[in-house]
């Protein structure tokens, strides 16, 4: 083997780890960029507005007890994201503003709508998959037993309050749509709201249906 070839071979083995690192780094950079682009698509900086208002959902939930205001506030204070003046008003006074979802309020809305979904009386909770798969122990799911911001035990509020009045057609629309929306965290449809994201999304669908949203 010639000296030149030896040098090339030696150089290959010496540089191979660094080359591999460089290739891996480029792949990781590309993957991160792709993830960032996807995140921007599903959670844009400008946010997006849905055709529904908060109205008196907040006061209703505080009145029912599914939200203990002190516990709710403390949760956000502990995470260094204290509730804003507007968020406190949504909870205590209600709001006629349309609901805008953005990066700044997504954590607030997750818990807000989790409570709505848990407390709102609906066929999904009374007769749906969560009852079927719960086998008499519906309170064992993360979306039910995992709710810790209520006055008493979470199942005391399960499907107990008519927070979002819906006519039969609107409830049927929710049941039609929720079975086709799957969550990447657990690969279950919203028709089976066994986690907090599923319960929150169920509430959003119910609120939109009550505001005459269509399937499209």
Descriptions of predicted regions:
Residues 15-35:
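Ser/Thr/Pro/Gly-rich low-complexity linker/stalk segments immediately outside membranes or between
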Residues 10-11, 52:
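Intrinsically disordered, low-complexity segments enriched in small/polar residues
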Residues 1-10:
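Hydrophobic membrane-insertion alpha-helices, especially the h-region
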Residues 37-199, 214-215:
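Acidic/His-rich structured neighborhood in mature extracellular/periplasmic domains
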Residues 202-210:
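Short glycine/serine- and small hydrophobic-enriched flexible loop segments
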């Amino acid at each position: 083997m010639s000296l030149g070839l030896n040098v090339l071979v030696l150089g290959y083995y010496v540089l191979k780890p660094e080359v591999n690192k460089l290739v891996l780094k480029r792949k990781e950079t590309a993957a991160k960029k792709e993830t960032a682009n996807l995140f921007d698509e599903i959670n844009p900086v400008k946010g997006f507005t849905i055709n529904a208002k908060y109205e008196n959902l907040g006061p209703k939930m505080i009145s029912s007890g599914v939200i203990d205001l002190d516990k709710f506030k403390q949760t956000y204070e502990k995470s260094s994201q204290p509730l804003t003046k507007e968020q406190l008003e949504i909870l205590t006074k209600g709001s006629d503003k349309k609901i805008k979802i953005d990066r700044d309020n997504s954590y607030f809305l997750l818990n807000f709508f989790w409570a709505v979904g848990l407390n709102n009386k609906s066929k999904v909770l009374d007769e749906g998959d969560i009852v079927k798969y719960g086998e008499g122990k519906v309170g064992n799911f993360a979306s039910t037993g995992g709710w810790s911001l209520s006055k008493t035990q979470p199942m005391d509020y399960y499907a107990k309050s008519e927070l979002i009045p819906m006519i039969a057609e609107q409830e049927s629309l929710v049941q039609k749509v929720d079975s086709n929306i799957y969550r990447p965290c657990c690969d279950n449809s919203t028709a089976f709201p066994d986690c907090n994201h599923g319960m929150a999304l169920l509430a959003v669908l119910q609120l939109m249906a009550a505001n005459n949203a269509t399937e499209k």
